[in-house]
């Protein structure tokens, strides 16, 4: 589709061929082998090397950042391929101290290969520069972070990484390519768990790497094929279907999340609210200004908050009392969910922090449920 049309229109029509007699929706292709005439189709010979469903999904995802995408069986599989492609020869993986714990687990597994994870507050550009220049490094960024929703300066990080000769990966799962484009800021690659907002219906586990670096794309494709981290055709079909409604969903979820964050900030039982774009007591207002500049169209569906008394028991009671919001993990689905995040092994979130994924229910209903859940003494 011509670039004259918006990203939203291109997503809706992704995977559809304007050919008379052909389906108006992308087909599901559950094939493990492909017909050849002596020479296999480029990229398709055996099912581990390609599938029309992946290719349609990858084209749509890449289009959001004017780049190319490689789909994987999960976000962790995508992360592993990136680390295996970029970490060799580097002593450090500099990553956020409050980022997704799965990334820390993967980075830690590279220690036997001579690479170690170095956690740092990515908002502190001077600290990031010190770590990147101390030894050959890979910068593994995440903004907003999960679950504290901290916002780091992508352009500033990219400049420091480039000066240090360090590739920069940005986990863009929370924002998606609609709300934030890391490659435009100078990132080497964007990383996604498509399980979350992109698929949007809590029925798919997939991941993706998006980049404009042809060499890196070839490397991660090779790791996908040789390592077997391929997406299933049905999962790719579901994710592409979800991607078509992402603009509508993310806009509503972002607006509702902002309203809920503001409501929670004034609640007597809430001691802290973590959400980009809102000014909070004790937080430098430049943080919200950066968020608004970096994510001008919204801040995504994820927020977190802390309650009094500050304990696991108090937070668990709030979560258990909900009548509409589901007590469940993950985020980005059409249904609202929440959980006490520190219940997961290895999670470094405050013990009483509740992470909430805002769905597409009417925000008035969500506020009603939140208020009655917070009535627990």
Q: What kind of feature is each model-predicted range?
A:
Residues 16, 32-36, 174, 196, ...:
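Glycine-rich beta-alpha junction loops
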Residues 1-29:
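Short conserved active-site loop signatures built around small residues
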Residues 35-39, 216-217, 310-314, 345, ...:
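Short, acidic Gly/Pro/Ser/Thr-rich loop/turn segments
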Residues 27-28, 33-81, 85, 102-110:
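Conserved N-terminal alpha-helix of the aminotransferase class I/II PLP-enzyme fold
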Residues 107, 118, 336-377:
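PLP-dependent enzyme catalytic core of the Aspartate aminotransferase-like
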Residues 220, 315-323, 369-374:
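Short amphipathic alpha-helices in soluble, non-transmembrane regions
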Residues 2, 13, 69-267, 274:
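Conserved PLP-enzyme active-site core in the AAT-like
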Residues 270-354, 358:
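Conserved C-terminal alpha-helix-loop-beta "cap" of PLP-dependent enzymes
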């Amino acid at each position: 589709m011509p670039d004259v049309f918006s990203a939203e229109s291109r997503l809706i029509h992704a995977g559809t061929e304007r050919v008379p007699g052909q389906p108006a929706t992308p087909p599901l292709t559950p094939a493990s082998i492909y017909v050849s005439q002596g020479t296999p189709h480029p990229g398709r010979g055996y099912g581990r090397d390609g599938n029309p469903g992946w290719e349609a999904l990858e084209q749509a995802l890449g289009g959001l950042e004017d780049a190319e995408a490689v789909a994987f069986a999960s976000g962790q599989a995508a992360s592993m391929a990136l680390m295996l492609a970029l970490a060799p020869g580097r002593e450090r993986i500099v990553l956020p101290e409050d980022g997704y714990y799965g990334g820390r687990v993967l980075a830690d597994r590279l220690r036997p290969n001579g690479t170690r994870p170095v956690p740092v507050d990515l908002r502190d550009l001077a600290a990031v520069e010190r770590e990147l220049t101390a030894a050959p490094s890979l910068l593994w960024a995440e903004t907003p972070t999960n679950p504290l929703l901290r916002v780091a300066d992508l352009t500033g990080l990219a400049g420091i990484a480039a000066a240090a000769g360090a590739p920069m990966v940005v986990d863009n799962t929370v924002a998606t390519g609609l709300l934030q484009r890391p490659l435009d800021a100078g990132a080497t690659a964007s990383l996604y768990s498509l399980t979350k907002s992109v698929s949007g219906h809590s029925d798919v586990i997939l991941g993706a790497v998006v980049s404009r670096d042809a060499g890196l794309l070839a490397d991660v494709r090779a790791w996908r094929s040789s390592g077997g981290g391929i997406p299933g055709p049905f999962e790719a079909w579901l994710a592409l279907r979800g991607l078509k409604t992402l603009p509508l969903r993310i806009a509503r979820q972002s607006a509702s999340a902002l309203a809920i964050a503001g409501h929670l900030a004034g609640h007597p039982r809430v001691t802290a609210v973590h959400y980009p774009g809102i000014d909070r007591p004790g937080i430098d207002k430049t943080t919200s200004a950066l968020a608004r500049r970096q994510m001008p169209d919204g801040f995504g569906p994820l927020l977190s908050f802390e309650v009094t008394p500050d304990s696991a028991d108090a937070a668990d009671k709030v979560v258990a009392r909900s009548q509409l919001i589901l007590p469940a993990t993950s985020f980005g689905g059409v249904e609202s969910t929440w959980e006490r995040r520190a219940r997961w092994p290895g999670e470094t979130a405050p013990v009483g922090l509740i992470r909430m994924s805002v769905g597409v229910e009417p925000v008035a209903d969500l506020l009603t449920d939140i208020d009655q859940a917070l009535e627990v003494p």
